Amino acid sequence: MQLNKVVLAYSGGLDTSVIIPWLKENFSCEVIAVVVDVGQEDDFETIKERAYKTGASKVYIEDAKAEFVKEYIFPTLKAGAVYEGKYLLGTSMARPLIAKRLVEIAKKENADAIAHGATGKGNDQVRFEVTIKALMPNIKIIAPWRMWNLKSREDELNYLAQKGIDIPFKKEESYSTDWNIWHLSHEGLELEDPWNMPNFEKVLMIIKNPFSLNDEPETIEIEFEKGVPIKINGKEMNCVELLKYLNKKGAEHGIGIVDIVENRLVGMKSRGVYETPGGTILHYAHRELEYLCLDRATLHFKEMVAIRFAELVYDGLWFSPLREALSAFVDKTQEVVNGTVKLVLYRGNIYSAGSKSPNSLYIKDLATFEEDQMYNQKDAEGFINLFGLPLKVFGMVNKKAGDSD
């Protein structure tokens, strides 16, 4: 098959560097490499040079950090979405945004196809492709890992050598990682055995090892407006600055390490270690404020929504009608989530040190054990009689034979 232009999600790694000449060989096409900056702090000039060296006709470096935080991270934070009780969805949130940028450039360049370097075993192939199908239904999608017969890193290096492309990729001796402004993930090597405890001195790249910390407790205050963090210690920051600041503080105190065996969308279990320092702090603070501001029914129902929201994000269904509808519900709940949370960070732990809100539903006069004017304790008897009536009726009707009244 011959194509005119293919837009490739390019990272600068070995896989996507091999894909460029492979696409040109198999589709006789021009390859446009797209690098989306979601906070991975790579050397983008070196990546651009590598893309051209491997045969790209054009390279886009897209700064998407602010969009990532405002349009993906904060809506997920407001939802309280955590996959399987642990994973804060760092990679899952980034993939739909990257795919969206690929679609935008494919339209701009009038491309025939979009290609990606996700393997046939992982979740990312699904996340990329369902997003592309949602936003550009008729464009062709190319997934080389499901097509070519290159089976190993050595095969890929040999392929580049055959093409006369000399790039100094080293033998794989480190973990498979994914990095953005929200998190850093680690998979592979000894982590593939769930019985092995991670060697934090070897694994961790951002967060300090909590077992060797000698830090002092640090108090911070985070102010929220409609569920969105806007200030740290009274200082207003833009979304990227705020998250970077909390990443730094969390990392210094050993906060945000998650070791999880998770259920992949494609049917297998995988084990990963995630570093999410700022995200862990924000989730904790946001939840503390919701305890203060949301009524019981809303808080409890929102917990169910959070589970489904997390599954949708994990599965790559960011642009689905259901995710958008759930976000509308979440936004309504967050209208009253305003206020400040005070936290203490210390040796891998977060401690709540106080919270306040103009929308606080906590009324001291109601909660006090002392005599008060707002709550008549005698009213409780009638409430209990009505609340317990269904159980009383069930007990009367289904009373076992021989039971005494």
Curated annotation (Swiss-Prot):
GO CC terms, sorted: cytoplasm
Pfam assignment, any one: Arginosuc_synth
Residues the entry annotates as binding ATP: 9-17, 117
EC number(s) recorded for this UniProt protein: 6.3.4.5
GO biological process assignments: argininosuccinate metabolic process; L-arginine biosynthetic process; urea cycle
Gene3D superfamilies, alphabetized: Argininosuccinate synthetase, chain A, domain 2 (3.90.1260.10), HUPs (3.40.50.620), Single helix bin (1.20.5.470)
Family that this chain belongs to: Belongs to the argininosuccinate synthase family. Type 1 subfamily.
HAMAP family found in the cross-reference section: Arg_succ_synth_type1
PANTHER family: ARGININOSUCCINATE SYNTHASE
Protein name per Swiss-Prot or TrEMBL: Argininosuccinate synthase
Protein species of origin: Caldicellulosiruptor saccharolyticus (strain ATCC 43494 / DSM 8903 / Tp8T 6331)
